């Protein structure tokens, strides 16, 4: 994609170009829904608009939930003390995502929040099989960007964003026979900023600082 002009075409430095839909790309409210096996449901509601003032806004919220397979068999745990290798009711998955964006002339602001809760039936990290191992991931960010074309050959872009990530899990360590679960919690927050100046050279080449 276009990012290869900055990072090269080497497959080890792959660049994914995500182009967010603008308010003008919507026709009011959009909705979608779906259902599947294992009590699986998902849905999305989106709204976008461009006003006469030039302000554009976008909002989108989505949800996914699944009870998963109630009886998953793992031959590696096929012993009587491990419920004969069957993990019962440990495949639940839930996530929700919220996105909002504003655009006015050369200035844009976007926020995003994502959360996922997942039960893991495979007894990872030497935990007790057929006991609850659940994970909780949260990720969010807010991004403010200013982008302007200067003259015929220069493009200025400046942005600043705030990010956070949270992870937690609950589990029973292996060879533990109590009723109190062990928990892990990880929190991270960071700020980022960048300024880019791009100049077109010889009509078809770009130089970025």
Provide a role label for each language-model segment.
Residues 1:
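Periplasmic plug
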Residues 5, 25-26, 34, 46-135:
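Periplasmic-side early beta-strands and strand-to-turn transitions of outer-membrane beta-barrels
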Residues 11-14, 73-75, 124, 173:
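Short, glycine/charged-enriched secondary-structure capping and boundary segments
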Residues 12, 34, 39-41, 94-96, ...:
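Residues that define the transmembrane beta-barrel architecture of outer-membrane proteins
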Residues 12, 27, 41-43, 55, ...:
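Hydrophobic core residues within well-ordered beta-strands of beta-rich domains
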Residues 18, 31-33, 61, 144, ...:
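Preference for bulky hydrophobic residues occupying beta-strand positions
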Residues 101-117, 136-209:
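Face-selective signature of the C-terminal outer-membrane beta-barrel domain
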């Amino acid at each position: 994609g276009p990012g290869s002009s900055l990072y090269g075409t080497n497959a080890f430095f792959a660049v994914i170009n995500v182009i967010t839909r603008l308010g003008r790309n919507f026709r009011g409210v959009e909705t979608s829904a779906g259902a599947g096996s294992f009590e699986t449901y998902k849905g999305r509601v989106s709204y976008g608009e461009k006003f006469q003032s030039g302000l554009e806004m976008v909002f989108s919220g989505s949800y996914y939930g699944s009870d998963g397979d109630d009886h998953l068999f793992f031959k590696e745990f096929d012993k009587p003390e491990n419920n004969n290798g069957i993990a019962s009711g440990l495949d639940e998955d839930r996530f929700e995502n919220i996105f909002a964006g504003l655009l006015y002339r050369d200035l844009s602001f976007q926020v995003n929040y994502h959360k996922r809760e997942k039960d893991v039936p495979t007894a990872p990290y030497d935990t007790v099989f057929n006991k609850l191992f659940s994970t909780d991931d949260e990720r969010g960010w807010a991004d403010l960007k200013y982008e302007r074309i200067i003259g015929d050959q220069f493009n200025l872009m400046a942005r600043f964003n705030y990010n956070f990530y949270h992870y937690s899990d609950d589990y029973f360590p292996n060879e533990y026979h109590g009723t109190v679960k062990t928990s892990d919690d990880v929190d991270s927050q960071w700020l980022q900023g960048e300024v880019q100046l791009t100049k077109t050279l010889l009509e078809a080449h770009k130089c970025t600082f």
